[in-house]
Amino acid sequence: MSNTGSAVPQTTSSNPIVFFDVALGGEPLGRLKLELFADVTPRTAENFRQFCTGESKNQQGRPQGYKGSKFHRVIKDFMIQGGDFVNGDGTGSCTIYGTPKFSDENFTLRHDRPGLLSMANSGPNTNGCQFFITTTATPFLNGKHVVFGQVIDGMDIVRMIENTRTTRDKPNQDVVIIQCGEM
């Protein structure tokens, strides 16, 4: 595993493209399209992709994933965080690999611009279902969080979420992924 990074690659046609349809306070904001860097971070990208499509099943055999989950943490000029469909508050963790967490895949890509998709974690090798999207360059996260995708359409939606009113970094109105899947 390398801590040195390279610039984010251009969109690669073989990489999966997923989407989130997002609502704020019950009102639709629009669609985010995300490229997953399966060519650089295949395990991390696949974990996220299956939570977008609902292919992953819980212990009861029901689909589990991002549909209906919230962006529970929003910090202006930093990032928007979501993906905790377990508890909804940033404490839950789940993977497609049958464990609550999985290891950091690599730190090849850097947090060098807005619109990057990266794993939220609670320390080394604690990746699960939570993710964040950067709203600025965040180089202090390099070597700590795995970059595994980028926003390819809908950065205006990210900015709307970033600018929503919050109390202690929690949006005052629910920011919900009302639909998601693979393009």
Swiss-Prot record:
This is Peptidyl-prolyl cis-trans isomerase H. GO terms for molecular function: cyclosporin A binding; peptidyl-prolyl cis-trans isomerase activity. PPIases accelerate the folding of proteins. It catalyzes the cis-trans isomerization of proline imidic peptide bonds in oligopeptides. It is found in: Nucleus. Residues 19-182 form the PPIase cyclophilin-type domain. One of its GO terms (cellular component) is cytoplasm. The keyword Nucleus applies. PANTHER family: PEPTIDYL-PROLYL CIS-TRANS ISOMERASE (PTHR11071), PEPTIDYL-PROLYL CIS-TRANS ISOMERASE D-RELATED (PTHR11071:SF561). Its main location: nucleus. The keyword Nucleus applies. SUPFAM superfamilies: Cyclophilin-like. It comes from Emericella nidulans (strain FGSC A4 / ATCC 38163 / CBS 112.46 / NRRL 194 / M139) (Aspergillus nidulans). One of its GO terms (biological process) is protein folding. Belongs to the cyclophilin-type PPIase family. PPIase H subfamily. The lineage of its organism: Eukaryota, Fungi, Dikarya, Ascomycota, Pezizomycotina. Its EC number is 5.2.1.8. Keywords: Isomerase, Nucleus, Rotamase. CDD domains: cyclophilin_ABH_like. It catalyses: [protein]-peptidylproline (omega=180) = [protein]-peptidylproline (omega=0).
